[in-house]
From Swiss-Prot:
Catalyzes the ATP-dependent phosphorylation of N-acetyl-L-glutamate. This is Acetylglutamate kinase. One of its GO terms (cellular component) is cytoplasm. The lineage of its organism: Bacteria, Pseudomonadati, Pseudomonadota, Gammaproteobacteria, Alteromonadales. Keywords: Amino-acid biosynthesis, Arginine biosynthesis, ATP-binding, Cytoplasm, Kinase, Nucleotide-binding, Transferase. The keyword Cytoplasm applies. Coiled coil: none annotated. The gene is argB. SUPFAM superfamilies: Carbamate kinase-like. Substrate binds at G46, G47, R68, N160. InterPro entries: AceGlu_kinase-like_sf, AcgluKinase_fam, ArgB, Asp/Glu/Uridylate_kinase. Gene3D superfamilies: Acetylglutamate kinase-like.
Length: 262
């Protein structure tokens, strides 16, 4: 099997790690996609576990514009929660579903380059695509790479990368289709109703109105960047929704479609 244009990059958030049924459903979806010959990459966050570990160590969680502020002294705890506990929880769920996986992080095999994103955010990284060879090899075996959003700078320091942005960069690296999965069915309007499609102008308007904010703002901006880069829609959907998971297996559109500029 060689790498094809069927690479599907799925991103999941930390809330999934607190839901065994959700993890089982996601991995069953991945298994069915792999059995169809699709190639799947899973990128994950783990904010809930990070918050728990920081609290247990007497440290507080601070966010700026939806991004986690990461002081250097918190980095060992964050790296352990994401590249360690979160990653292995997902590998365990993959094993239960009969999926062969490989636990990885953005540090591995030169897949990305990473620099400090903004001094105000501390050890938060901004990544760019670099070398796809390792991922292409893993995908060609029919395995599922499960990738945490911990990266490494040129001088070896660990950096915390927003998982939506990490998934976006890997979709660019592989020329793949990106689906951002969270615990909500997509982007919702002010009345809590799913918005089926959004372009950049509509996103700007909803941000100004405060309908899209914080973590969803980061997610939608990452999705829009990839949509523009690849010239195809990026989907924002839910791992909680069994109907959306079934549609994903069939290759149907799910959730909110973030559209590229025409």
């Amino acid at each position: 099997m060689s790498v094809t244009n069927k690479v599907l990059v799925l991103k999941v958030g930390g809330a999934l790690l607190q839901c065994e049924m959700g993890m089982a459903r996601l991995m069953d979806t991945a298994r069915q996609l792999l059995e169809k010959g699709e190639q799947v990459v899973l990128v994950h966050g783990g904010g809930c576990l990070v918050d728990e570990q920081l609290k247990a160590n007497g440290m507080e969680t601070v966010k700026l514009d939806g991004l986690r502020v990461t002081p250097a002294e918190q980095m060992p705890i964050i790296a352990g929660a994401l590249a360690g506990t979160s990653n292995k929880l997902l590998q365990g769920a993959a094993a239960k579903a009969g999926v062969v996986s490989m636990g990885m992080s953005l540090c591995d095999a030169n897949m990305v380059t990473a620099v400090i994103k903004d001094e105000r955010l501390g050890m938060v990284g901004e990544v760019s695509p670099k070398d796809a060879k390792a991922l292409e090899f893993i995908l060609a075996q029919g395995w599922l790479p499960i990738i945490s959003s911990i990266a490494m700078g040129e001088d070896g320091e660990l950096l915390n990368v927003n998982a939506d942005q990490a998934a976006s960069v890997l979709a660019k690296l592989l020329g793949g289709k990106l689906v951002l999965l969270s615990d909500v069915s997509g982007v919702l309007d002010g009345k809590g109703k799913l918005i089926p499609s959004l372009n950049s102008q509509e996103i700007d308007e909803l941000v100004k109105l405060g309908v899209i904010e914080k973590g969803m703002k980061v997610k939608v901006e990452a999705a829009l960047e990839v949509a523009q880069w690849l010239g195809q829609p990026v989907q924002v959907a839910s791992w909680r929704d069994s109907g959306q998971m079934a549609a994903l297996i069939k290759g149907e559109a799910v959730g909110t479609q973030i559209q590229p500029q025409e």
